[in-house]
Amino acid sequence: MGKYYCDYCDIYLTHDSMNARKAHNSGRNHVANVRDYFAGLGGNQAQSLIDQIIQQHESGGRNQMMMAPSMRLGAGFMNPLATQPGYPGPPPPGAFPTFPPTAGTPPFRPPFPPSSAPGAPPPTMPPFLPPNASAGAAPGIGMGSTPPFPPNTASPNPGMPPFRPPMGMGMPPAPAQAQAQGSPMGMPQQGQQGTFTPTQEVPQGAGAGIHPDRLRMLGQ
């Protein structure tokens, strides 16, 4: 372990860390030694020395901030992440940051499973068919064509009536009740009681309500 040497106190610190340096610099003996050292120098020499120390401190502080945390001096005040156990360290400049995995988190899976040999298809994909594999296939099925759909063998719903065919395709005849009704125009049909044809005679009592021209046509 390296040791830090203090020029003002002329001693070596036990630990070379930022916390140990701060504790030593804030001590009473170190402050008194620094005051005595600058008091023994001349005014101009002391001022130039102070300016050099300030310049070196500012340039060194900027360099410390621009450096990666793992390359800084010690761990603790300037590099708190290096003191945490299990932390992989900061990424290099230009890379994405990484975080330590939490307990119970599965590792990251690759996007594709590794193949057994270079150029071989993945285990989940079937191998490609040769070019002449469609020679013995059924007609209509070849390379690039989709197989036909299976026939619909599902039974109809038991609660639904059977499908009725369209008009003109095996429709049953109209019931006899519909034929027994009157014609659309309201004219009586042949075979009903109280009807007559033009060749028959006009019933008795029917001339009063018939037009004269109609009677002449009937031979009255």
UniProtKB/Swiss-Prot annotation:
Cross-referenced InterPro entries: Matrin/U1-C_Znf_C2H2, Matrin/U1-like-C_Znf_C2H2, U1-CZ_Znf_C2H2, U1_snRNP-C, Znf_C2H2_sf
Zinc in keyword set: yes
One Pfam family in the UniProt entry: zf-U1
Zinc finger (Matrin-type): 4-36
Biased composition (Pro residues): 88-130, 147-165
SMART domains, A to Z: ZnF_U1
Example GO molecular function: zinc ion binding
Keywords noted in UniProt: Metal-binding, Nucleus, Ribonucleoprotein, RNA-binding, Zinc, Zinc-finger
Bias (Low complexity) ranges: 166-200
BP GO annotations: mRNA 5'-splice site recognition; spliceosomal snRNP assembly
GO cellular component terms attached to this protein's record: commitment complex; U1 snRNP; U2-type prespliceosome
Region ranges (Disordered): 88-220
Cross-referenced SUPFAM superfamilies: beta-beta-alpha zinc fingers
Superkingdom: Eukaryota
Keyword Ligase: no
Compartment annotation: Nucleus
Biased amino acid composition, Basic and acidic residues: 211-220
PANTHER family in UniProt: U1 SMALL NUCLEAR RIBONUCLEOPROTEIN C
Known role: Component of the spliceosomal U1 snRNP, which is essential for recognition of the pre-mRNA 5' splice-site and the subsequent assembly of the spliceosome. U1-C is directly involved in initial 5' splice-site recognition for both constitutive and regulated alternative splicing. The interaction with the 5' splice-site seems to precede base-pairing between the pre-mRNA and the U1 snRNA. Stimulates commitment or early (E) complex formation by stabilizing the base pairing of the 5' end of the U1 snRNA and the 5' splice-site region.
UniProt family annotation: Belongs to the U1 small nuclear ribonucleoprotein C family.
Subunit and partners: U1 snRNP is composed of the 7 core Sm proteins B/B', D1, D2, D3, E, F and G that assemble in a heptameric protein ring on the Sm site of the small nuclear RNA to form the core snRNP, and at least 3 U1 snRNP-specific proteins U1-70K, U1-A and U1-C. U1-C interacts with U1 snRNA and the 5' splice-site region of the pre-mRNA.
Name recorded for this polypeptide: U1 small nuclear ribonucleoprotein C
